[in-house]
Every structure is written in structure tokens, then in C-alpha cells.
């Protein structure tokens, strides 16, 4: 029989369920698993992950073979490509969408060139028939998934189609996989759909497959101690790399017997050396240093096996690289070799056994390489498969947050997927804080249907807002843009009692007016009595002309019998007919725009807090209008100002607690982290915040934040004297170091930068 391309791939059948029958007696199944934070974790967390991984290896008995496969593929990131396809909306901003898509493409190239990194564990059992194999594999699968889950690792079992796609993509790097079990003809092998056009294993050090040249090597461990960074360093190479670890446990009593035999051999050698010394007439206690070291190693290994819960494994490590030219291939291999040498190990080409090397690297669970090495659980666990968690949510509402500083993968996330989408953006002046906020706003406008509202105390968002035809509302005593603090709509607050919720806001505002220790119980009662009366006309006939203004409340309070009514009216006077009467008008601005910016830069210091409170209330109006139909994103710059006063602080906490129910996504932005952290309400804010974008921090603030958010020392480096646009992103339970170098030659950059010399 002629030997065909398919004969190289040595399995009998790969079933739809994901079970692969390798030969008469062996069956395997595969699980794909994701990365977790290891490199930047707290020391105790790192130790925990390491021990959990070693225990995970210990859980396999000698009847099971395990293969860990790490596959890095260039240009295979379909998921990433689809995530950056921002669809046009024909709303006048499609030129910016095009620019944003191009920017994302260039970020991928700048990052790791769309390198797809995958991790798999394949487990193989021996069984007499498929039925027996299925029950064994299913039990194992449940155990492996739960072990990985307990380490915080997301993992999922692969079905037949998914396993075939992985094999196809390794063997056909430039082709698209097209296969469905429905189309499989009777007696046709699934191999037909995964093999390349040709295999040529004639050369001794290379092999050809399709249009590519590959090389398989085995990894020789010569070092006495290994680093848990080594595997990560190999996988950091931005090139096509396949690495497989074949691991099989040795029966514990066998392992102990084996080590004891070694110990006996060494003792015999020592006796021989002693006799030699006596015959030659020198001191019999002087032994060759190699023999002493070796003897100590064997004794400590025996102790580990007997008392330290260590197990012995037989491990084979195979590498496979490929490229279109021998020169490119040799470059990558020499890169790998130099990392191996640095760690006192060696990458050795599998001369004349390239075919066996290729088979051993495929995630099938087959090891054709007879070169192995005995390692304990801890030595095997040193090949730690985890480095950094990725944050990549493939959703139509995902926004761009830069590149992962460790893996250089795109960070795409959708805050709406969080339990609490509320957020904070924190950073010192010049850290890129405003820029990050603007980038998120612009991205949200381009990608989602959400409304965006900004409270702008420094007047720095106007450029961006005008770019997107938004409305900039200048709130100041000189401006002719008016906001009525008494505005209400029928959905206001919880919707069932709009006035009750509105009363809360009016009380908060009047507490600011009165100052001191706030309103007395008597004053609150009088206000509460007046409010339904001033809204009567509007509720009977809800037209804009019937909306009450502060003047109506002032008149009503003045007309009350109690002295406190008149006292309150007097205290309100300056805001009604005096020099601070900017809020005593009906609203005359278009609040229905998709993008709204309240510019309060010229609102005097006396009115700033009231201004921020009134804006917050207008946002409530908007959120309650949008409820159920779309999200409302609200950005509050200089957020620490709102948390300084009890009244504005408690109102802000209310927003933080209740907004999400109605589709509101508030974001506080501040450079004054110290002031923010001093607020009594900060615990409530942090407890209800699942998104924190942290840029460079001042040293004192850094320490407080590290305690509050459990940041490890290696993570802290990313917010210590860091460059503009670099920092840490907290997204639910995920912490990712990021960097964002936004291209300066774009329309958006010009509209987002706050550097005077760059604004055109």
C-alpha cells in the first residue's frame, strides 16, 4: 500500500463528541484553557497558584497520559479581526469610524501582530472499547475542569469539530478550515479535512508541509534549578511556535524503589572510592565532589517523595517551528535556543525523526519521542502555563482600552457586562486621564447607541463634543444657557413616585443653600408640604410652560405661616432674584442630543457644587427617560469635589447605587486621589465600582490604593512614574496592565488632546 499524507497522522477516528481513538486501546480528549494572572500576582497568590498546579499534576495516576500544548499562531486571530469591525451607521461620523478601525488594526500590528495564543490539555486513557473509554474520559474531564476552575482558570471541553480545527490550523497555517460532520461521507476519514497537500520528511533536520518548512526539536533539561518564567519567555516570542509537554506519572512505590536503587548504587561507588584511597595511601574520607553532590541530590529526592507529597513524572518536551523560508525558521529557532541556553537547557534538533516530532507536537495525546526526563511534581510545575490574564470581550458593545502591557494583546471590554458598570478614572496631571476618558466617550459614540453626558468643570471637552455634533451647555451667571433644577418627567427616579424622588434632590440642593449643618426637621416638613402644590399645574397639564421654577418655590415658602418658611425664602433669595439667579429659569437647551456636555468652568465657586448637583439631577431625568431603551453614560470630572460636602456626596452615592438599575453608567474622573479617599462615602463608591482605570499615581495615593484594591508590588510598577497612557485596568476581578499610544495623526487625537501645542 502506498504511504499517503493521511497516514502520517496516526489516529483511527475523531468523533463528533471530541473523543479521538488513537489505536485499538487508546482514546483522548482535549480541553482549552485561558490564562490567569501569575506574573504580576501577589507573592502569596503566586505560591498558591504554583502549589495548586503541582497538586493538579499529582492528581493524575500512571494510567493516564497528559499533554499540555501551547500554540502561538500568526495571523490566526479571527476573533480579534471581527472585534475591530466597527459597522458604519451613516450618521455623519463614518469617516471617524474608518479612522478608528484603521487605528485598531495598526495597534494589533504594533502589539503582537494578531498572534493567537492557545493553551490545551489533552488526556489519554487506555480502554477495551469506546464505551469504557467514554466513561473514563468524562470522569477525568469533570475533574480537570473543576481543578482548573479552583485555580480561577476559565476552561472548556472541545468537541470533534473544534479539535479538528486546531489540527487543521497547525498543519495548514494559511488556509481556512471548512468542515462539518454532516458532510462527512460514510467511510471517509476526518483526516481528509485537516492534512496539508504534501508532507516531505526526506531532509534529516527539516520537513516540508504544504508551502511551509517545519522543524521539530526536543528540549533537554540540563539545569539543576529552573525558573517559572522560562515557558512564558518562549511564548513571548511573536512567532509561530508549537510546544508540547508529554507527562506521565510513575507509580509512587515504583518511584521510591527506583530512587532507593540509585542511592544503593551511590553507596557502592563510595565504598569503591574508599578502597581505592586506602590502596593509594591517601585519606579515605576525601570523595570526588560530583559523587558527594549526586548523593545529596538523591537523598533529598527520596525525602521529597516519602514526606513532601512529591510525585515522579516522566516528561518529554517537543518544540515545532515553521516558516516559509529556512532562513526565517532558523532565526526563530536560534531565538528559542538562546533562551534555553540562558536557563542552562538545550534545544536539540530531532535528526531523522522529524515526522515523529511533528506527531508528538499535535494535541492528540501521542508521544513518539522516546527521549524523556524524570521530574518531580514541583520541577514539572515550574513549566507554569500562566503569565497574564487577557481582557478581550467579543461583544458588539466592546470598547478599546489599549494593549496588554505584558502580552501586547488588544484590550477590548464591555462595561455593561459587569455586575456594577460604575467606574473611576484616576491619575496625576499629565498621566493621560482626560484623554482616556475622552477615548472611551468617542468609542462609545462610534460603537454603541448610548447617550453620553459630561460634567466638565474645566471646559476641556468642548472640542470633542462639537466634533460629534453634541451640545455644549455653558452654565454660568453670564451665560444664556439655562437649566431648571425643578425639571421633572413622569419617569423620574423609580417612575412610580416621581415627586418623592424629586423631593430628595430639592432637599439636597436646599441644604447646600442653607449651609451649616443642613436643614432641620421642621424646615424639611415645610418644604415637603410646598412641593406638591408647585407641581400641581404641571401634573395636570405637563407642558414646558407649566414647569415650576425656583421663584415658585420661593413664593410658596414665603407664604407659609411658619417662621421657618420665611427664613428659608430669605436664604433662597440670592438664588432667585439676587446675583446667583442663574438657576431661576426654565430650561432652554436641547437635552435630547446623543452627546451633552455641561461646561461649568465659569460658574463661580459659590455655585459650583449646586451646579454639579443640578447637572446630576438632569442626568437622572435623562436616565429615567432612556430606561429600558439604551444606556446613559455619565462622566463627572473633578469628582472629588462632589464627595467633599455631605449633601452632594450622599446624592452621588445614591447615583452610584441606583443608576445601573436604569441603564446608567457613571464614571468619576479625578487627579485628587487624596481628597477622594478622604471622603466618608468613598467605601460606598468603591463597593459599587467594578471598573477602575488607574494611570500614574503620586506615592502617597499609590500606597492607599494598593491596600484598597489589593494591588501587588509588580502591578504597582505600572502606576509608578509611568508614561502617559500607561497604567492598570481593573475590570471586575481581572487586573490588566495596559498601554495606549494613540496615533497623533488622526482627527480624533486632535479633538481629544489637552496639550495646547497639539490642538489644531
Residue positions per predicted region:
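Conserved P-loop NTPase
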Residues: 709-760
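Post-Walker A helix-loop "phosphate-sensing" segment adjacent to the P-loop in P-loop NTPases
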Residues: 443-453
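P-loop NTPase motor domains
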Residues: 36, 43-62, 73, 233-236, ...
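Extended, folded cores of ATP/NTP-driven motor/assembly subunits in large transport
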Residues: 1-388
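Hydrophobic positions on the alpha1 helix immediately C-terminal to the Walker A/P-loop
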Residues: 436
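A short helix-turn-beta junction within AAA+ P-loop NTPase domains corresponding to the substrate/partner-engaging
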Residues: 469-473, 681-694
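Conserved lysine of the Walker
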Residues: 433
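Hydrophobic anchor at the beta1->P-loop junction of P-loop NTPases
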Residues: 425
